[in-house]
């Protein structure tokens, strides 16, 4: 890590032509330090527009890295923002192929050392994992936050195999609106109107395709790390939150990936850890700079001395406004070597072999929705009062529950 912070040079009007002639729009964030390069580079590929929707967020991320001698490249996916073409689906083979072409272009630039990383939160995290599965030349490290291992059973489509109805009425509809916005004429120049009309007329709705695939088939296995954990060789930093819908995937990847890896799980929802709700927050940019500094530049910064998993353990009472009570716990292995089977009697032997409870249909409707953590009540007592609940007497000693517990009744 450099001892001084470099000035940053930003260029929002960078374009790279794909092998089929479609032009993608990029923004580069470069260390402005004469004679100090070339630099490693970190790439992020998103459909969320780099020139307006995500500009402030991108600047915060890539200026931080560039000041520390790591170039940043932010890409608008084909058919979004400043990029031409049409986006036909999320995480399509075309999208990942485009990303590999962008990586190759970045590696050839005079300001780049050829040592590449990728990062992202949610879509960008998926993109980093899926690109790493193809092992493109030069890609040595990734950071994937709030991403999952299984596009079918652990994403926003069919959670556990059941249709995720709440997200299907929200997520794909919002993407129709976002994909329908015009490119910025000040960025793409002449031809912006024709790009926009083509986008409006040609971009399909995604939901019908998802509904045609209601079981784990090749459509969902594409881009799912669980289909081949061994395909990812790049050093992988995983970041998640206990109130996020993708934390199960983080734990599965931490256990099954073979590459150098570390993970952090905080109390947040689907947020950037540095501003996550509920607090405490976590400086993910500092950790990212260390991760990429070590794996792309060879910095001896101790990042691989961190425990395999650093996780926030909630304690009672768990929440105080927007703050979560608890402490950080370090695990050198995953699953934990000291895990035990915990046996407690919840009742007595009875002749009945089943229990039935017909509760009101609104149970659970007032709890915070997935991807909306930090909004609404976190007190489960009203739902408990209208549900079938199995509970013990007060425990005699503290008990940490960490990971994916299995309960046998």
Residue ranges and their predicted role:
Residues 232, 238-240:
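Short beta-strand/loop motif that positions the catalytic acidic residue
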Residues 278-408:
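C-terminal, loop-rich substrate-recognition/catalytic regions characterized by aromatic stacking residues
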Residues 1-37, 395-397:
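N-terminal cap/lid segment of alpha/beta-hydrolase-fold proteins
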Residues 125-136, 253:
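Short glycine-enriched nucleophile-adjacent loop
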Residues 244-250:
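Conserved alpha/beta-hydrolase "acid-adjacent" motif
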Residues 110-122:
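Alpha/beta-hydrolase fold nucleophile elbow
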């Amino acid at each position: 890590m450099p001892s001084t912070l470099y000035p940053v040079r930003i260029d929002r009007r960078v374009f790279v032509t794909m092998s089929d002639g479609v032009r993608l729009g990029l923004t580069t964030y470069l260390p402005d330090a004469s004679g100090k390069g070339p630099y490693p580079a970190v790439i992020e590929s998103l459909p969320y527009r780099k020139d307006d929707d995500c500009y402030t967020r991108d600047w915060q991320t890539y200026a931080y890295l560039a000041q520390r001698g790591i170039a940043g490249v932010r890409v608008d996916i084909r058919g979004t923002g400043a990029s031409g073409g049409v986006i036909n689906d999320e995480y399509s083979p075309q999208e990942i192929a485009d990303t590999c072409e962008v990586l190759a272009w970045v590696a050839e630039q005079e300001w780049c050392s050829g040592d590449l990383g990728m990062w992202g939160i949610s879509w960008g995290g998926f993109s980093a994992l899926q690109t790493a599965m193809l092992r493109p030349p030069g890609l040595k490290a990734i950071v994937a936050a709030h991403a999952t291992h299984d596009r079918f059973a652990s994403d926003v489509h069919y959670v556990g195999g059941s249709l995720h109805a709440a997200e299907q009425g929200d997520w794909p509809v919002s993407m129709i609106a976002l994909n329908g916005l015009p490119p910025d004429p000040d960025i793409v120049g002449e031809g912006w109107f024709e790009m926009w009309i083509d986008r409006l007329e040609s971009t399909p709705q995604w939901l019908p395709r998802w509904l045609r695939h209601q079981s784990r088939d090749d459509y969902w296995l594409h881009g799912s790390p669980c289909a081949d954990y061994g395909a990812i060789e790049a050093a992988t930093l995983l970041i998640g939150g206990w109130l996020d819908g993708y934390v199960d995937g983080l734990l599965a990847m931490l256990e099954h990936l073979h590459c150098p890896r570390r993970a952090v799980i905080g109390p947040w929802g689907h947020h950037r850890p540095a501003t996550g709700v509920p607090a405490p927050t976590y400086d993910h940019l500092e950790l990212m700079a260390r991760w990429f500094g070590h794996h792309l530049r060879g910095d001896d910064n101790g990042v691989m001395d961190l425990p395999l998993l650093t996780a926030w353990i909630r304690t009672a009472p768990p929440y105080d406004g927007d703050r979560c009570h608890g402490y950080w716990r370090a695990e050198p292995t995953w699953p934990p070597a000291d895990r035990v089977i915990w046996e407690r009697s919840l009742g007595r032997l009875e002749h009945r072999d089943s229990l039935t409870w017909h509760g009101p249909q609104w149970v659970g409707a007032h709890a915070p929705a997935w991807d909306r953590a930090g909004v609404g009540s976190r007190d489960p007592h009203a739902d408990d009062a209208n549900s079938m609940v199995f509970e013990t007497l007060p425990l005699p000693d503290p008990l940490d529950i960490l990971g994916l517990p299995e309960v046998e009744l």
